[in-house]
Amino acid sequence: MTKVLVLGGRFGALTAAYTLKRLVGSKADVKVINKSRFSYFRPALPHVAIGVRDVDELKVDLSEALPEKGIQFQEGTVEKIDAKSSMVYYTKPDGSMAEEEYDYVIVGIGAHLATELVKGWDKYGYSVCEPEFATKLREKLESFQGGNIAIGSGPFYQGHNPKPKVPENFVPNADSACEGPVFEMSLMLHGYFKKKGMLDKVHVTVFSPGEYLSDLSPNSRKAVASIYNQLGIKLVHNFKIKEIREHEIVDEKGNTIPADITILLPPYTGNPALKNSTPDLVDDGGFIPTDLNMVSIKYDNVYAVGDANSMTVPKLGYLAVMTGRIAAQHLANRLGVPTKVDKYYPTIMCVADNPYEGYAVSVKDDTWYGGTVSIADPAAVNHLKKELFTKYYMWTKGDMALEKFLASW
């Protein structure tokens, strides 16, 4: 029996595992290895921070959900992949080391939030990128009496060599891994403090390591700047954060921004497990270069999906799901199941929600990749879409078989 390991438990990995098992059935054993038995619907973690959702509402127990679909599950932290001998090494919850051989592996363990690169993070930093981060921020916001808030992202340490075997325009250079959560939090906080009657006591500054929202068209960026102007939000470009202090943040050039609360999408680097793997599996940033079918350019039994793939820029949930689906479809063909393989075409697709004010901004944009689509639409119906998508993900336990049909809402 062909053995397929899927590493990870978020959008890319779960999409790959569920899709592959649905396609190949008993033709392959599919096993997921993830560092936790729980997976979370991360697009709603900002909602936890502002108190409209609880973390437990967003939790999927993979040890129950995956076996229900005929997929094996193993809790364990991946330490490295030996691509030459087709082995994965991981640490079990009890601390013991284990190894597992594979015929094929789909790598979806994401990147690394490099908080260690920002001085003062442990004492003064806040974020919404992990469940525990969102909960900590929620507690801070509840007790906040007013002052300065800075929201932004750290630098993205993108790999460049070797390059993936895809059209060059599909992989633009990015200063930030993804600024969608920054945009969303800036809108959410306006609604949050308006509800608390504190707008006159709070001053928000949004910062970016490069040009803010550079993955959108100039017209969309102008629209965002106009929204910020109306909301009284200050925008600072080219601010590469180096340190968080009690009442300010500092960039690499010594510039400062007032900040009594700093909300940060931390610097983004390659996953340590991938950097520890077979050297020619990854690029110089620790990401896996692939072709358009998500197959490694060096090892044809290795697939990479989501943030672990060097091709996915920015590091976006929509792209993770697309890559997971394509990898599964391509592998199904190799396992003897004729399957149409979707074409990879990168597009920025996201919804920046503002639940307290009852609207969201729906974004669809491919201009960064040479396309002509540029939509940034604020509307009440988009808030409803985000609510429904959250419910759909939780209802399916991450098995979003209809996602590609729903994404064009």
From Swiss-Prot:
Enzyme class, UniProt record, top EC level: oxidoreductase
EC number, UniProt record: 1.8.5.4
Family, similarity comment: Belongs to the SQRD family.
Compartments where found: Membrane
Function recorded in the entry: Catalyzes the oxidation of sulfides, such as hydrogen sulfide, with the help of a quinone. Has the highest activity with caldariella quinone and decylubiquinone, and lower activity with naphtoquinones. Consecutive reaction cycles lead to the accumulation of a polysulfide product on the active site Cys residues; these products are released when they exceed a critical length, typically as cyclooctasulfur.
Catalyzed chemical reaction(s): n a quinone + n hydrogen sulfide + n H(+) = polysulfur(n-2) + n a quinol
Reported cofactor(s): FAD
GO cellular component: membrane
Stated name of the protein: Sulfide-quinone reductase
Quaternary structure, from the entry: Monomer.
Keyword Lipid biosynthesis attributed: no
UniProt topology in membrane: Peripheral membrane protein
Organism: Acidianus ambivalens (Desulfurolobus ambivalens)
InterPro entries: FAD/NAD-bd_sf, FAD/NAD-binding_dom, SQRD
Residues the record lists as binding FAD: 8-12, 34-35, 129, 271, 307, 317
